[in-house]
Curated annotation (Swiss-Prot):
Protein's GO biological process: glycine decarboxylation via glycine cleavage system
Modified residues (N6-lipoyllysine): K61
Residue intervals of the Lipoyl-binding domain: 20-102
Name this protein carries in UniProt: Glycine cleavage system H protein
Length: 126
């Protein structure tokens, strides 16, 4: 499995050997949201900036922006999410991914947290 990187806004990115990052929200985030009922995904070909609005997730509790942890071009969106948004709750780090990006600035990964740092960050929130 590729290494996971995390943001303080509870997004994750996993980058493959071809420089494609798969992006989603963390298990912590989905638990805070509650049952996800709607997901709006970015368009293929869209250029997104690190920290910029990329997608929307709505739950029974709230609507929330999903920010991109990296800059690049959207190359794929998880087409199954609009029909089955609950995948975000059941498999946030797997089938519940939101979109994939061809990284334009791979060095941005160095500014993100690894699993250990993210776990410590979340531990301070509870």
């Amino acid at each position: 499995m590729s290494k996971l990187y995390f943001t303080e806004d509870h997004e994750w990115v996993s980058v493959d050997d071809d420089g494609i990052g798969t992006i989603g929200i963390t298990d912590y985030a989905q638990k805070q949201l509650g049952d996800v009922v709607f997901v709006e995904l970015p368009e293929i070909g869209r250029e997104i900036e690190r920290g910029g609005d990329a997608a929307v997730v709505e739950s029974v509790k709230a609507a929330s922006e999903v920010y991109s942890p990296v800059s690049g071009e959207v190359v794929e969106a998880n087409d199954s999410l609009p029909e089955a948004p609950g995948q975000v709750n059941t498999d946030a780090l797997g089938d519940g991914w939101f979109f994939k990006v061809r990284l334009s600035e791979p060095a941005e990964l160095d500014e993100l947290m690894d699993q250990e740092a993210y776990d410590a960050f979340v531990g301070e929130l509870d």
